[in-house]
């Protein structure tokens, strides 16, 4: 599913790209691309809304309950049972940390390309297309690999590849090398994103997938500002200090960006270390053994 979504993103980009590249002197094509993307998304979502049916059976509300009170009571039940899901909690902590590394890489890829390698708009667009193509294969192959050898192992491999790409970028000096690194990162990061969501479903008890996915989504959204903030403060702080010491502005900015890249690696490595302490077997057992008391 993640691979198909990435492929759809490539198709949308290719459809709007000619107008953005060919029409000069105005930002109208860029503004129009947002409208086109919204329409593209709406049309693509229609089959889901119209033809996919819920498998679950409708359950009547308990006496004296409405949907809001029932939601809060079940949330309280899940919070009270948190000790039962220690492996899932460790998994979420690991996710919060390495996901910030992923967000940092996505948010600053274009800036890194422009500052370190002098990439122009056309080159950045080509870079994004390459990353998207790589992400299709990364999501698809990580899913197959996870089905065969285990999703935890697939996630670890994807994170190791991502860390390798970031470390390589620390020392890379060529534009061609950056294109290769970005493609490897695109391949790895979609594997991370796809497999983490799959593992959330695997770790969720029967009938509580929505609660666990909601917790997973909220945790990721509420923490995702930390990594980019660290990157921005570090890159800017290092650059300003070097400029104050008399270093040429561009060189100072480049060193600042490499300091930021190092922080990406730190987030990914720390997240991986915590992930290695998670027992997939115990997490699955906890989900199977859980019997909620309504």
Give residue ranges: language-model regions.
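Glycine-rich segments within core transmembrane alpha-helices of 12-TM secondary carriers
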Residues: 1-19, 219-228
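A membrane-interface helix-boundary motif in multi-pass transporters
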Residues: 17-39, 233-268
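Multi-pass alpha-helical transporter architecture, strongest
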Residues: 40-51, 261-294
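Juxtamembrane intracellular "pre-TM" segments in multi-pass secondary transporters
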Residues: 53-92, 294
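Short amphipathic helix-loop junctions that connect adjacent transmembrane helices
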Residues: 107-123
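Helix-to-loop junctions at the C-terminal end of transmembrane segments
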Residues: 137-151, 235
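Structural signature of the two symmetry-related core transmembrane helices
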Residues: 153-168
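Helix-loop junctions at membrane interfaces in 12-TM secondary transporters
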Residues: 170-181
């Amino acid at each position: 599913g993640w691979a198909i979504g990435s492929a759809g993103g490539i198709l949308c980009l290719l459809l709007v790209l000619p107008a953005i590249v060919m029409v000069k002197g105005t930002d109208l094509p860029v503004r129009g691309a947002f409208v086109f993307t919204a329409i593209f998304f709406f049309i693509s979502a229609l089959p889901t809304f119209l033809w996919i049916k819920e498998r679950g059976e409708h359950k009547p509300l308990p006496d004296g309950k409405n949907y809001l009170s029932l939601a809060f009571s079940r949330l309280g039940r899940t919070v009270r049972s948190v000790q039962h899901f220690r492996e899932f909690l460790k998994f979420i902590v690991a996710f919060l940390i390495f996901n910030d590394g992923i967000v940092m890489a996505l948010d600053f890829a274009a800036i890194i390309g422009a500052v370190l390698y002098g990439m122009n708009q056309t080159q950045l667009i080509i870079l994004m297309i390459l990353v998207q193509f790589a992400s299709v294969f990364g999501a698809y192959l990580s899913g197959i690999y996870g089905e065969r050898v285990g999703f935890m192992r697939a996630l670890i491999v994807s994170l190791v590849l991502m860390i390798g790409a970031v470390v390589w970028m620390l020392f890379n000096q060529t534009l061609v090398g950056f294109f290769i690194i970005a493609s490897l990162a695109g391949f790895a990061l979609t594997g991370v994103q796809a497999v983490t969501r799959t593992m959330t479903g695997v770790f969720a008890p029967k009938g509580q997938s929505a609660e666990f996915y909601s917790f997973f989504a909220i945790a990721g959204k509420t923490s995702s500002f930390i990594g980019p903030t660290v990157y921005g403060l570090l890159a800017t702080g290092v650059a300003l200090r070097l400029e104050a010491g008399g270093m040429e502005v561009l060189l100072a900015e480049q060193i600042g960006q490499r300091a930021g890249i190092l922080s990406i690696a730190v987030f990914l490595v720390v997240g991986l270390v915590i992930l290695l302490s998670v027992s997939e077997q115990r997490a699955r057992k906890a989900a199977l053994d859980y019997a909620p008391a309504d």
